[in-house]
Amino acid sequence: MSLFLEHTKPLITTMLKPNNTADLVRDITAALKEGTDAFCLEIELMKTECRTATDYKDIFGAMDNKPCYITDYRRLNINDTEQSDEELTEEMLFAFSLAENVKLFDIRGDLFDPSPDEITYNEKAIEKQIALANEVHKMGGEVLMSSHPLRFLPYEDLLKIAKAQQERGVDIVKIVTLAESENELRENFEATLKLKKDLEKQFLFLCGGSHCRKHRLLAPLLSNSLFLSVQRGIDGGPQPQMDDAKKVMELSGIENGKWKMES
């Protein structure tokens, strides 16, 4: 099984948006035909009645053994009943345990202690995050830690969050900010190159906002990380369609839609 860390080119990863099993399987089938490398199942978008072992097995089983990563974000959860971080974690661990191709586990940077910019500095919460990362590793998985400040950050603040994540035993650092002007876009490109130099871990630095598109299309090439995209005809917001992601990779000299394991 190919893991999310074992690639030499940006990994085209299809973000799955439907809220029910039938539509998820439909979109997975379409993404496979378009040539996706991997998937992300956003559990927070799924209906409660679809979060069962049978449904998860149908969903993961449709992926043709492509690697999958999972999220369960508090701020996007469509559940009618608010779930605690502990409940969200148990829900993720349950899904994670059901299929061998589910390999990447997203831990929010403020898990167990909701905090500004989705990053906590509370020692007890950090200890629980580290313990969770260790548990996922023991299960044979990899860990991504994500923070979504969803505002522009100067590099010093960005690096502080990235290094805090890096120190918590995770494999991939992920931060999502904003670019609402050409100047913020330029600084985000500069930050991408600086992070590549200043971080030891693989990272995924993205942005939303009115000026995010260039960064969304080019940043994965600069960081050689995951290329988050959606399949043809799906509204992914700031996430580009897979066709565009593959075209950028092809034009940049990277084999279209493919990646090779390091020898």
Question: Each PLM stretch: what is its role?
Answer:
Residues 4-138, 142-155:
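Active-site beta->alpha loop and helix N-cap motifs at the rims of alpha/beta catalytic domains
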